């Protein structure tokens, strides 16, 4: 690798190569888990004792607790039990165009993206950091609309923006606006990809490919009715956990789509995964966009659709819950015993082919 190409941001093999190169420098057990959000605890495996607290206070390590105690808007649960496990996820958003339709823009996306990542490891999101990089010349009207979208989605998700930053760069040095958010949530029940094993059922929470297709429509000024699926997934995830469905792993199918998620799971678990083509719902509008531009819907990004592995005995309960939110949720496959790290796509006639991990320049700046 001599220089960075657009393909290095596409969610496929080139991106995995880049991540390995960069983050191997910071190698630790938490990073190695490769979940959507890092699962951490403060003060090690237990509560800080009095001497530890004194030492930590001198080193500034208790600033989080102290700041929360001084903030009268925080609930009591937010300032206790720093030895609990938490999930943290950060993401930067460079969506182009910054407005996809009347409902979805970079503001809504930046909240849903980070909040959903925290939800995917079984955490309840509580706090959000918010940082803007704004290009000189962005209209205040656009900025206000984006800010209102952020506020609306934070209220829906039940998260507070607790810190932030704003930078302005000269005209021509950016593309209207970039946003970074970091979500912070308390673990309800940890769901980690390292626990994927033979016999688990694979489900998807809805139809696939709509966000990527919506971006293509806007960039090419096409007449099409396809809308992004961008949404916060808190209701779906919390319903599954509240009903004690045995969810083993979850992943939102963003860059690289369904294909990227399944291939990552196959690689991490060392197991084959089979999925059934007729069980995966793809809307006709998305199929049309894929045919026009030569994409596979399995590789198109989603921003409000997630994939999950559950115990076989719980698959119908999981499906019933998910279909309350999206009738297109479905059971799409299972984890096999073969240790070859492949994703196998089987059609209605029994013919099979490998669903490869995405490669090359897919669709840059979709989130």
Report residues per predicted region.
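Extreme N-terminal starter segment of soluble prokaryotic enzymes
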Residues: 1-4
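Glycine-rich phosphate/pyrophosphate-binding loop regions near the starts of catalytic domains
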Residues: 13-52, 75-204, 210, 222
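Active-site-proximal betaalpha loop/short-helix elements
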Residues: 19, 28, 135-137, 226-302
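Short Gly/Ser/Thr- and Asp/Glu-enriched loop/turn motifs at secondary-structure junctions
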Residues: 34-35, 300-305
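Charged/polar low-complexity intrinsically disordered segments
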Residues: 53, 58, 66-70, 76-77
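Short, compositionally biased
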Residues: 214-229
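Helix N-cap motif at beta-to-alpha junctions
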Residues: 310-315
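Acidic, Ser/Thr/Pro-rich beta/coil linker or hinge segments at domain junctions
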Residues: 324-367
């Amino acid at each position: 690798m001599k220089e960075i190409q657009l393909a290095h941001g596409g969610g496929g093999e080139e991106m995995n190569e880049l991540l390995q190169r960069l983050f191997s420098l910071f190698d630790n057990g938490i990073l190695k888990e490769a979940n959507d959000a890092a699962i951490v605890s403060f003060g090690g495996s237990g509560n800080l004792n009095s001497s530890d607290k004194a030492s930590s206070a001198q080193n500034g390590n208790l600033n989080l607790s102290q700041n929360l105690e001084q903030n009268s808007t925080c609930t009591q649960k937010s300032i206790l039990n720093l030895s609990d496990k938490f999930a943290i996820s950060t993401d930067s958003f460079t969506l182009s165009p910054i407005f996809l339709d009347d409902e979805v823009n970079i503001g809504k996306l930046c909240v849903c993206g980070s909040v959903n990542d925290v939800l995917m490891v079984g955490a309840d999101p509580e706090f959000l950091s918010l940082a803007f990089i704004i290009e000189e010349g962005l209209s205040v009207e656009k900025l206000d609309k984006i800010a209102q979208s952020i506020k609306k989605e934070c209220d829906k998700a039940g998260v507070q923006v607790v810190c932030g930053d704003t930078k302005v760069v000269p005209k021509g040095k950016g593309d209207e606006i970039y946003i970074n958010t970091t979500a912070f949530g308390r673990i309800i029940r940890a769901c980690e990809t390292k626990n994927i094993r033979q016999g688990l059922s694979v489900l998807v929470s809805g139809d696939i490919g709509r966000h990527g297709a919506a971006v293509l429509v806007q960039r090419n000024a096409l007449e099409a009715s396809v809308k992004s699926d961008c949404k916060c997934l808190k209701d779906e995830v919390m319903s599954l956990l509240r009903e004690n469905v045995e969810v083993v792993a979850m992943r939102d199918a963003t860059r690289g789509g369904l294909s990227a998620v399944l291939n990552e799971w196959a690689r991490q678990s060392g197991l084959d995964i089979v999925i059934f083509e007729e069980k995966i719902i793809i809307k006709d509008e998305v199929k049309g966009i894929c045919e026009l531009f030569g994409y596979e819907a399995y590789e198109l990004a989603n921003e409000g659709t997630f994939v999950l592995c559950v115990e076989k005995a719980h698959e119908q309960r999981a499906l019933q819950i998910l279909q309350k939110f999206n009738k297109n949720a479905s059971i799409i496959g299972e984890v096999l015993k073969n240790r070859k790290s492949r994703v196998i796509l089987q059609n209605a006639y029994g013919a099979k082919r490998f669903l490869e991990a995405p490669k090359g320049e897919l669709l840059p700046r979709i989130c």
